[in-house]
């Protein structure tokens, strides 16, 4: 039987599954739409599609390293309860192992890449959604490489609510690298050093501080000096090397790193759900939405 566009459209409307999944299911069932629906349900595709419009803002981060390669990833679920589920934890580890080995460059490339079991990452996640019963997404990941004379530092806070992977060059001291990662988790700097702050951002802050000083009635001849002092505090807030080290506030991070003749190559910090707008459902509306299903 010929698979028409109308038939594919009808199956999409009934299941919410993607066009190619619908076309494939119809082909396999010789155009029988009821059997195609059952097939999509069996594969978990219809179930996953129905959850696609939900918001997944909970979840966990995870970090794995192997030799000179490291990966940090964030996988989201709808609830914190599911994030603690054994099936979710297994999925998180499987994805981390795969990303570490495959080293895809983008989320799209990651989704399309084949895992050891022969399924793509996207299919593997879809299968997990069918078993676990919540929307799950691989939100982001970073694959980082280092030289032999360098150290990875990884730190997970609150069981993975915040994850940081840092790289220190010029040293193989993993304990120091972990301390730097812990500092980044706690303080959340925007930059490694002040030379990474754009001139535009620095000038904007300088202008704000100048206006504040003038409004405080400070004499113009000392405003410039005051502004530079306050600008240094601004850099201390946003630049890792200028910050007081969390384990010893009497020292700056740059002093701690320099003592080992090391430098900070990079760091990646993920906090679960940051930047995702969580939907606030009213309880009555939630009940009605369940009744209507």
UniProtKB/Swiss-Prot annotation:
SUPFAM superfamilies: Elongation factor Ts (EF-Ts), dimerisation domain, UBA-like. Residues 79-82 are annotated as: Involved in Mg(2+) ion dislocation from EF-Tu. It is found in: Cytoplasm. Its main location: cytoplasm. GO terms for cellular component: cytoplasm. Signal peptide: none annotated. Keywords: Cytoplasm, Elongation factor, Protein biosynthesis. One of its GO terms (molecular function) is translation elongation factor activity. Belongs to the EF-Ts family. Associates with the EF-Tu.GDP complex and induces the exchange of GDP to GTP. It remains bound to the aminoacyl-tRNA.EF-Tu.GTP complex up to the GTP hydrolysis stage on the ribosome. NCBIfam families: tsf. This is Elongation factor Ts. The gene is tsf.
């Amino acid at each position: 039987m010929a698979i028409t566009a109308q038939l594919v459209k009808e199956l999409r409307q009934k299941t919410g599954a993607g066009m190619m999944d619908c076309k494939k299911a119809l082909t396999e069932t010789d155009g029988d739409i009821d059997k195609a629906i059952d097939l999509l349900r069996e594969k978990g595709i219809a179930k996953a599609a129905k959850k696609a419009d939900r918001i997944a803002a909970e979840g966990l981060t995870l970090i794995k390293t192997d030799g000179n390669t490291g990966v940090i990833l964030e996988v989201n679920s709808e609830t914190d309860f599911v994030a603690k589920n054994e099936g979710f934890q297994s999925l998180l580890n499987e994805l981390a192992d795969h990303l570490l080995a495959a080293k895809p460059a983008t989320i799209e490339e990651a989704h399309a890449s084949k895992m050891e079991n022969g399924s793509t990452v996207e299919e593997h996640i879809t299968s997990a959604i069918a078993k676990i019963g919540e929307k799950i997404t691989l939100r982001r990941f970073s694959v980082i490489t280092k030289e032999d004379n360098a150290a990875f530092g990884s730190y997970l806070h609150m069981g993975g609510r915040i994850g940081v992977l840092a790289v220190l060059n010029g040293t193989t001291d993993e304990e120091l690298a972990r301390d730097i990662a812990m500092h980044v988790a706690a303080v959340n700097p925007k930059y490694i050093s002040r030379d990474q702050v754009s001139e535009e951002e620095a000038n904007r802050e300088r202008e704000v501080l100048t206006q504040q000083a003038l409004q405080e009635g400070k004499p113009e001849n000392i405003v410039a000096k005051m502004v530079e002092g306050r600008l240094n505090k601004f850099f201390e807030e946003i630049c890792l090397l200028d910050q007081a080290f969390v384990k010893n506030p009497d020292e700056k991070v740059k002093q701690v790193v320099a003592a080992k003749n090391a430098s900070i190559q990079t760091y990646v910090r993920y906090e679960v759900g940051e930047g995702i707008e969580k939907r606030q459902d009213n309880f009555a509306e939630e009940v009605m939405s369940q009744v209507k299903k």
